[in-house]
């Protein structure tokens, strides 16, 4: 017989998958990868100047994934990178990136809060 704890974990996993699918569809509708969406979302949440390391920790995304997405977003003129102390890289919106994020990602952020 399945324990209450196992049933609860299965239910949690199912809900997590459903939520993840919703965010995936939102990102696709904006022609963004999931990681690019999370980076822009994080910049809106934490503000200009957050580090790539902050994003990795906050969303449990690998450094390589964040770095690849940041490079792609930078190539598209959405954000810029600036060196920080040591090896830290800080991210800042371009004017286009801020407008895009506030228009498209801002409503998602507002809906959650």
Regions from the PLM with identified roles:
Residues 1-30, 78, 99:
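N-terminal leader segment of winged-helix/HTH proteins
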Residues 2-6, 58, 62-63, 91-93:
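Membrane-interacting alpha-helical segments
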Residues 4, 15, 22, 35-36, ...:
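N-terminal positioning helix adjacent to the helix-turn-helix/winged-helix DNA-binding module
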Residues 11, 39-42, 107:
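Residue-level recognition of specific faces of alpha-helices
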Residues 21-65:
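N-terminal helix-turn-helix DNA-binding core of bacterial DNA-binding proteins
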Residues 71-113:
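Charged, amphipathic alpha-helical coiled-coil/dimerization segments
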């Amino acid at each position: 017989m399945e324990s209450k704890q196992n049933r609860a974990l299965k239910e949690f996993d199912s809900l997590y998958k459903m939520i993840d699918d919703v965010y995936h569809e939102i990102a696709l509708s904006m022609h963004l990868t999931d990681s690019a969406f999370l980076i822009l979302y994080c910049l809106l949440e934490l503000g200009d100047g957050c580090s790539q390391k902050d994003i990795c920790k906050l969303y449990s995304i690998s450094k390589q994934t964040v770095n690849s997405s940041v490079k792609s977003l930078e190539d598209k003129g959405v954000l810029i990178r600036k060196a920080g102390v040591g090896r830290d890289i800080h991210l800042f919106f371009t004017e286009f990136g801020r407008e895009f994020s506030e228009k498209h990602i801002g409503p998602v952020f507002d809906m959650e809060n």
